[in-house]
Amino acid sequence: MTYPSFTSGEVLTAADMNAVGLWLVKTQTVGTAVSSVTVTGAFSSTYDNYLITLEGGTVSADGDINLKLGASATGYYGFLNYGDVASATPLGATRNNTAQFNWVGGGAAGQRAHVHVQVFGPNKAAYTKLLNGTYQSGSNYGTIQGEHRVATAYTDFTLATGTGTLTGGTIRVYGYKNGLS
């Protein structure tokens, strides 16, 4: 399979553009020493599924980064499979009807913050699925899967620290193309 490659000034055809599967929908810069960042206008009916990333910037303390859809503060369920680099024992943790998706990212004190999570159907009036959140808190690493069991369509989300603050970095929201049309 060949992948599209574009040059400055080139006329792009529908065939060229239809080959692109992931579209950058929104970017937002994180401020200085903030405990949360709300990203508005991130989800729409144009895309069913999304990838959310946060790269760069730093966290002030070991801890996770959490995600909330719109203003919904209930109905979040999930399971975290994780481990500590000093132990070979796998660990698990659950969330049952909590106020947010925990563990979608994180970092170690003074180091880079990160989020990388897939969100399925946030703009549909149905349950929203969350897959492959990349958790870190100090030397603990893991992956979360979850579901938001509130049948509401959302356009916005908030990323928040579990402890400490975020400084700098960029949140990017990508929409997965719905088909070849």
Where would I find each of the regions flagged by the language model?
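Surface-exposed molecular-recognition determinants
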Residues: 2-181
